[in-house]
UniProtKB/Swiss-Prot annotation:
UniProt-annotated location(s): Nucleus; Nucleus, Nucleolus; Nucleus speckle; Chromosome
Phosphoserine: residues bearing it: S149, S264
PANTHER family: RNA RECOGNITION MOTIF-CONTAINING
Keywords: Acetylation, Activator, Biological rhythms, Chromosome, Coiled coil, DNA damage, DNA recombination, DNA repair, DNA-binding, Immunity, Innate immunity, Isopeptide bond, Methylation, mRNA processing, mRNA splicing, Nucleus, Phosphoprotein, Repeat, Repressor, RNA-binding, Transcription, Transcription regulation, Ubl conjugation
Modification N6-acetyllysine, positions: K5, K11, K200, K297, K373
Coiled coil: 270-374
SMART domains: RRM (SM00360)
Cross-link (Glycyl lysine isopeptide (Lys-Gly) (interchain with G-Cter in SUMO2)): K5, K62, K98, K101, K128, K192, K200, K245, K251, K373, K469
Identification of the protein by name: Non-POU domain-containing octamer-binding protein
Amino acid sequence: MQSNKAFNLEKQNHTPRKHHQHHHQQHHQQQQQQQQQQPPPPIPANGQQASSQNEGLTIDLKNFRKPGEKTFTQRSRLFVGNLPPDITEEEMRKLFEKYGKAGEVFIHKDKGFGFIRLETRTLAEIAKVELDNMPLRGKQLRVRFACHSASLTVRNLPQYVSNELLEEAFSVFGQVERAVVIVDDRGRPSGKGIVEFSGKPAARKALDRCSEGSFLLTTFPRPVTVEPMDQLDDEEGLPEKLVIKNQQFHKEREQPPRFAQPGSFEYEYAMRWKALIEMEKQQQDQVDRNIKEAREKLEMEMEAARHEHQVMLMRQDLMRRQEELRRMEELHNQEVQKRKQLELRQEEERRRREEEMRRQQEEMMRRQQEGFKGTFPDAREQEIRMGQMAMGGAMGINNRGAMPPAPVPPGTPAPPGPATMMPDGTLGLTPPTTERFGQAATMEGIGAIGGTPPAFNRPAPGAEFAPNKRRRY
């Protein structure tokens, strides 16, 4: 655990020491001596600082993490130079454990430098301020932010591209750690942006793909241009102690900063340099104006071409819909024709079945009529048969009348015949009763047409009726 007093002292001295680092070497050395006299004891890796017995303030290093900030990124990676040749990775971690858990530690012992990655950018800034120029085994440590080798500069960004959209667009190439759209002091987009990947392969892939193709971020058809980001140090700059003190250095430093006197040698060439710089500025402005006019002209042509393209697309869509409508109409007509043909076939089949049924009914009726005629002869045929039977019966009676009657034993009933049916022995037209018809049916020769019927026998003597009784017909 660390004393909170020493930590707050270093935070208070952060800005003044950084301000006087380039201009007041003596004040910087005094602060360095204070650091040596009061070295900050390390704190555990859990990220908390417990106060001493006199002070009850506790600082949680997790509070230095911004909302939504990613941890252990390239932005929190520090370069540590002037390391002792015998330093170990464990000593390196122990040196930075005050600022939280370290994610990556690399040491190049032969060249005396290394890299370490902390959790957040804020913790890395605090570690850089406190450990820079700190003596370690006779050497002063040099702590800087490591160059982000996987960062790209994106130009020609459309107006309505935000940080989130830029990150989403470039995340197709790999994991993006940070994406920022650069704006001016009023918050207006400048058309430039920065994209930082977690590794070099993703940055190389994005650079190659965007160089070969046209990567569009919005509906505005202007592709973005991608190039490696220039690694510039705009925080520390070039301190006096890092300037190489060679012969040219001493020659340049012979005179202090001043204004050139008119009419002097240096004034004449200073004015010529100034004219050259002005001409460069004018030409650059002219180039910028030409580029601006060309961009405006291209945008106008693009709008006209876009309108024409939209009209063409609408025409194509209309033609496609008309073709689709015509095809649907043809399909509908074909379906109607098929339905009509099916109905005609069904109607023809129904008529054929009805005709077949009608023919079958007529055939059945004809057969029934023929069968009726064969079983029951008509009235004319029946009348002719009856006439023939009557004529045959009369002829038989006349023939048998000349012959003597056969003797009949007493008590024998008279045989059925016309004598028992009619009193005069003639055949009447009235049909006989069932009993007598049955008796007549037993006679021989009645059933054959044109055959000779048997003769009627004379009645027996006992069959005579009384004088007062009439014979029953």
